[in-house]
């Protein structure tokens, strides 16, 4: 079921039309992500949650790696402070307010509010 969902999501978003900074549902405009969730209901919300989790984990890992290698002073954050469901609801709420922004912009703003991790 998860593999099918992955391929379904991948085919939903055009990837050859332009260069992308981030890929998948978190790389889309908020309006597209909201339409996707509305169209596919709980499966759409699960896909959005998975994209959010992947984005935050990947971004945080890059921040941590750059910090540990001395390339940046920015430190990683505690990304599981709230439940994934709460984060998804936050992103959905912010996307409703500003449907023209990209989901990753909402996520980067959210990320900056998180406490620093200790490592």
Tell me the role of every PLM-derived stretch.
Residues 13-18:
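Sec/Tat signal peptide C-region and signal peptidase I cleavage site
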Residues 74-119:
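Surface-exposed, polar helix/loop patches in the mature regions of secreted/periplasmic/lumenal proteins
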Residues 2-11:
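Sec-dependent N-terminal signal peptides
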Residues 20-93:
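Short N-proximal segments of mature Sec-exported proteins
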């Amino acid at each position: 079921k998860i593999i099918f969902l992955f391929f379904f999501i991948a085919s939903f978003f055009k990837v050859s039309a332009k260069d992308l900074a981030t890929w998948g549902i978190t790389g889309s405009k908020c309006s597209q992500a909201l339409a996707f969730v509305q169209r596919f209901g709980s499966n759409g919300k699960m896909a959005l949650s998975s994209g959010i989790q992947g984005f935050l984990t990947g971004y945080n890992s890059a921040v941590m790696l750059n910090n540990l290698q001395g390339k940046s002073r920015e430190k990683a954050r505690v990304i599981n402070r709230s439940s994934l469901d709460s984060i998804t609801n936050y992103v959905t709420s912010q996307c409703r307010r500003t449907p023209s922004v990209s989901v990753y912009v909402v996520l980067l703003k959210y990320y900056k509010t998180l406490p620093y991790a200790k490592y």
